[in-house]
């Protein structure tokens, strides 16, 4: 895997994804290899290394609005959701992303 799967694969169109939400600045899609029955990834469409390095407050608000909207839909459809982001050594792909999850972990 590259350092930035989201820029190199998803945003470039090299890896086709099932979109859940899209705006000019944010994309949400079903994870290509889900770890939960519902596993949606929400990303900014420009490269941002992590939550700790984002300096564009407008983009951060747009991203969190998308996370909130996707999570609300998951709660409506499945009764519950988790929202997760990883930092430091826990962050495999060095592109800010949030996971919106529901159900019991499947792998």
Residue ranges and their predicted role:
Residues 1-107:
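HIT superfamily nucleotide-processing domains
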